[in-house]
Amino acid sequence: MAPGRRHGLGVLQPAEPRAAHRPVILSDGFSGGSTNLDQLWHGLEENGNFRFISELHAAGRDVIILGYHDRTASITANAETAIECISRAVHERVGDAKLAVGGFSMGGLITRYALARMESDPGLPDHETAMYLSYDTPHQGAWFPVSLQAFTHYATDKWGDHPTLGPALRQLSGLLNSPAAKEMARWHIGKVDAEPEQAPERLTFLGKLDELGGWPRNVRKIGVANGVKTGVGNGAEAGSIAVRGDGETLQDTWLKIQAQGDQIVARLQTAGDEATMVSTSGLPDIDGAPGGLFTMQSPAGDTGSFGLAALLMSLLGNVVDPDVIATSCFIPAISAVASGDINDPKALYRPIAAGDSALDAFHCAGRNEGHTTMTEELGAWLVNEIAAE
C-alpha cells in the first residue's frame, strides 16, 4: 500500500505528510471476510483506468479509506464503525473544512445510514459533512439471480462436505445468506425451494432507514452508476439458457436468464435423483437490465454470475455448454441513482431523466460495465464534484 497511517481497519491517505485538513471518507462495500485495505487501495489507485486517490490529492483532499472486520455483517452494525470513523475524522482534522463521506456498493448504504443517524440522534456528534457520495450503490436493492442462488444452495446441500469444493460452496452459500446480502437483495431465497422475496432483515433495515428520514438531510447527495441512463440493457436475452452442464455429477442442469411472468428459471438434477425445478412469478426481466454487472473474482479471474455457476459445474466433473452467458445485471442503474423501483420492469428499461433521482446530482456510465469499476468517466466526475464543494 502507498504511504498512509492505519487506524484499525481504516487508513489515512493525506495529500501531504500531515494530518487531514479536508477529509474524504470512502467506505468499502460487501464481500466475504474483512476488508483488504491493500486490495481496495489498488482498485482505486492502480486499476489502469483512473488514479482516483491521486486525483483527490491533487484537488487538495485527504483520503480516509474505511474498512470493516466483517463485510457480511448487517449494514446497521457496520454503520457504527462508520460513525466512529466520521467522528474521529472531525475531531482530528486540522481546520474546520467540511467532510465528504460515502462509499462503494454497500459502503454507500452504510454511510448513508450512518450520516442520517448522526443527524437524528442527539447523543451523537455533528457529522460536519457537506457531501454524501455513492458509487454504484444499491439504493433500491441489488439483484442476485434466483437461479444462481438456488444452484448455489443446491450444490452446497449435495457437495458441501466435498474435501476440495466443499469449503468454497459453503462460503458462497453463506455469503448469499449473510445479514448484509439479505439486507441488499431485492429478492432472496435462503434455500433451494424457498419463495423469492424480500428477507425480513431487509424489511427491518428499510424500516430503520425510513425512521431516520431515508437520507441524510444536511448534505449534498451525489452518486454514480456503472450502468447507462439510456435504458439500453446488457444484451442478456430474457428466458434464454445462461449456462447448462451435464456429466459426472449433474444431469441436464441449467439456469435461465430471468424473464417476466411465471417462469421456470432453473433445472437442477444430480445423477440418479429427481430433477428440482426452480420457479419464479411476477419478477421483472432484470438480468438484462442496464446497470453495473455482477463480478466475481476467482482463481480463474472474474467469472461473472452465471460464469461462476459454469466454473462450479466444471469443477464438479461436468461438461458445460460453450455458449455461456457469463454475467448479468447486479445493481440496476435506477437503483444506483435512486430513480425508480427495480420491481417495475418498465422503470428498469426507461431512460433516466435528471429530475428522476433522489440524489442532487448523478452521473451514469457510457456503457454497462462491471460493478464498482473505477473509470476515468465516473472517477473524474466525482473528483470535480468534490473539488467544487
Can you say where each PLM-predicted feature lies in the sequence?
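Active-site-proximal beta-strand/loop segments in catalytic clefts of secreted hydrolases
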Residues: 27-30, 66-69, 104-105, 135-138, ...
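Extended ligand-binding clefts on enzyme/binding-domain cores
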Residues: 114, 214-224, 229-233
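Loop/turn elements at helix/coil->beta-strand transitions in domains of secreted/extracellular proteins
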Residues: 19-23, 58-64, 94-99, 125-131, ...
